[in-house]
Amino acid sequence: MFFHAHPDDEALLTAGTMAMLAAEGHRVVLVTATAGERGLADMAPGEALGETRLKELYQSAAVLGCARVECLGYGDSGLSPKGGSAEERPDNAFMDADIEEAAKALAAILQEERADLLAIYDPAGGYGHPDHVQVHRVGRRAAEIAGTGIVLEATVNRDPLVRLLRLATRFYRFPPEFDVRTFESAYSPGEAITHRVNVRRYARRKRAAMSAHVSQASGGDSDRTLAVMLKVPGPLYRLVFGTEWYVRRDLPPGARLRHPFERWPE
């Protein structure tokens, strides 16, 4: 089972792994906490956007070979790094959800599916979105309740990312609100990563999953991250997006595993 905050998160971080496991014959289940109804798009935030993004989620899941898709029905906490003020957020914003209550809802699906593995986010929530941080908290607790044996935290090796961004600042002027230093505490350092999953064989499916999220390829005054990624040429795309990273906390930091179910020597 793969637990994400919003539709399109699955395509960015774990799509290759999901496609690989489905191709190997595993039953893959995708769960999102929200419908992403407060995301940035050319259409106004709200119920209509949420419905659109859920349709896109189902299209992405079909490409990846998912057997089941569920949404827990919490409200999208919005684009503000800290979710904005409580007055700006919906009453049922996921970042404000009772962790035990949300974890029980997720655990019920884990138990129903008899899931062997749950994929969530690292403690930083990747780049720090409050809904992503909540996915980590809720997912961890749900795995405890359900007795799920393997918990993988989807992440990115931030070491080469920070080096690349620092180099890019010499040649490219980023928007004023963009601060490379924020990535120094985002995602996970290379030494903490336990799984480096080669998903180059599934790059086309990963790209198709990204393409399914049409609403997230435009909106705002500048190029969206998803749109930029989809412009990367095929060979370079396989190189850049051909590895997916995970941290498994019950293994030694820096363990070098290449498959979610690979065993670490006792």
Model-assigned labels for residue ranges:
Residues M1, G84-S85, N92, D96-E266:
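Metal-dependent de-N-acetylase/amidase catalytic core
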